[in-house]
């Protein structure tokens, strides 16, 4: 467990981990010598709590990207299983493909039938390879579309969970129509009559994120990221140097706070102090509360109102004025 903790340790977390180790040493000494050090432990724990808050409330965009990519960050399946009372996974795009990078199915949210889907990363190297690191193929996006069409046909709200560095950019992806699959999803999501709530739970990268990201509301976890391209790709394109990813992350405005100011997202879902991977249960509770609140608001509108507002929401993005 100690080795795993060191492996997953982010550089900026080191002072916190050292303090936690100090607390454990004091506890061990107390047990060994039978000394009451409860007051000292309380003070150290208070310091650790304050330090954790200070670290995670002042993350740079580059550090936020590291948190969004944390191997122990809750995934789409983690959240679906945590927030739904019942869950049945559905498979396949009905064209011969069942991409494991996209998962989805029917569940109940507060006893309301909903269709939930999203990108799924792996927990270890083997699982990540099997799921292609959450980078979906054209078949994956067609599977997502099939599930969303099912939801629209049977009048069930759609909840999508975005967590991908980008769509798969391999030769086979182009051969099987990656661009067409993404574009088709965008068009159809604007047409659906049912409520659509999209949430960026980790990485929201490029067209791979947007392909399941057209909705009435776009929510985003506090330490998630959302951008037109991964910062490494942006740095390689602009400066021919992927090592300049931190500068690219600053320029891209990838954080939830920046995107809320720009009007790209509608709400920031708060994370536990220490990020979602430190307390997945609390993170899931925050997500469920946000989904239920936004779903109730969107369901109060007629289907024609939803479609018009959804369309106008995305038409407003990127609009700017120039001074003469």
UniProtKB/Swiss-Prot annotation:
Where in the cell does this protein reside?
Cytoplasm
- Mostly located where? cytoplasm
Record bears the keyword Lipid metabolism: yes
What pathway annotation does it carry? Lipid metabolism; malonyl-CoA biosynthesis; malonyl-CoA from acetyl-CoA: step 1/1
Tell me its EC number(s), please: 2.1.3.15
**A Pfam short name:** ACCA
So where does this one cross the membrane?
none
One cellular-component annotation, GO: acetyl-CoA carboxylase complex
Q: Mind telling me which InterPro entries this protein's record contains?
A: Acetyl_CoA_COase_a_su (IPR001095), ClpP/crotonase-like_dom_sf (IPR029045), COA_CT_C (IPR011763)
The UniProt GO MF terms for this protein read: acetyl-CoA carboxylase activity; ATP binding; carboxyl- or carbamoyltransferase activity
Q: What class of enzyme is it?
A: transferase
Give the record's keywords alphabetically: ATP-binding, Cytoplasm, Fatty acid biosynthesis, Fatty acid metabolism, Lipid biosynthesis, Lipid metabolism, Nucleotide-binding, Transferase
**Assembly mode:** Acetyl-CoA carboxylase is a heterohexamer composed of biotin carboxyl carrier protein (AccB), biotin carboxylase (AccC) and two subunits each of ACCase subunit alpha (AccA) and ACCase subunit beta (AccD).
Q: What is this protein called?
A: Acetyl-coenzyme A carboxylase carboxyl transferase subunit alpha
Q: Tell me what organism the protein belongs to.
A: Thermosynechococcus vestitus (strain NIES-2133 / IAM M-273 / BP-1)
Organismal lineage: Bacteria, Bacillati, Cyanobacteriota, Cyanophyceae, Acaryochloridales
């Amino acid at each position: 467990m100690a080795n795993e903790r060191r492996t997953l340790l982010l550089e900026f977390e080191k002072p916190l981990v050292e303090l936690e180790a100090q607390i454990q040493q004091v506890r061990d000494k107390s047990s060994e010598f039978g000394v009451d050090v409860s007051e000292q432990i309380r003070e150290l724990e208070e310091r650790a709590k304050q330090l954790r808050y200070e670290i995670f409330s002042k993350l740079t965009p580059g550090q936020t990207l590291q948190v969004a990519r944390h191997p122990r960050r809750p995934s789409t399946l983690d959240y679906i299983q945590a927030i739904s009372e019942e869950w049945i996974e559905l498979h396949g795009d009905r064209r011969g493909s069942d991409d494991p990078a996209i998962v989805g199915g029917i569940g109940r949210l507060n006893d309301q039938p909903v269709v939930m889907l999203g990108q799924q990363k792996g927990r270890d190297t083997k699982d990540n390879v099997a799921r292609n690191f959450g980078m979906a193929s054209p078949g994956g996006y067609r599977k997502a579309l099939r599930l969303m069409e099912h939801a629209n046909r049977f009048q069930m709200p759609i909840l999508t969970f975005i967590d991908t560095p980008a769509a798969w950019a391999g030769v086979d992806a182009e051969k099987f129509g990656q661009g067409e699959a993404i574009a088709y999803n965008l068009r159809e999501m604007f047409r659906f009559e049912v409520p659509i709530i999209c949430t960026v739970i980790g990485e929201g990268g490029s067209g791979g994120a947007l392909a399941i990201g057209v909705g009435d509301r776009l929510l985003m976890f506090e330490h998630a990221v959302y951008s037109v391209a991964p910062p490494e790709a942006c740095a390689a394109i602009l400066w021919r140097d992927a090592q300049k990813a931190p500068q690219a992350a600053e320029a891209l405005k990838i954080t939830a706070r920046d995107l809320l100011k720009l009007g790209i997202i509608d709400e920031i879902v708060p994370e536990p102090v220490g990020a979602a991977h430190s307390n997945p249960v609390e993170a899931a509770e925050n997500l469920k509360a946000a989904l239920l609140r936004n779903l109730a608001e969107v369901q109060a509108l007629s289907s024609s109102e939803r479609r018009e507002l959804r369309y106008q929401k995305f038409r407003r993005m990127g609009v700017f004025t120039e001074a003469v």
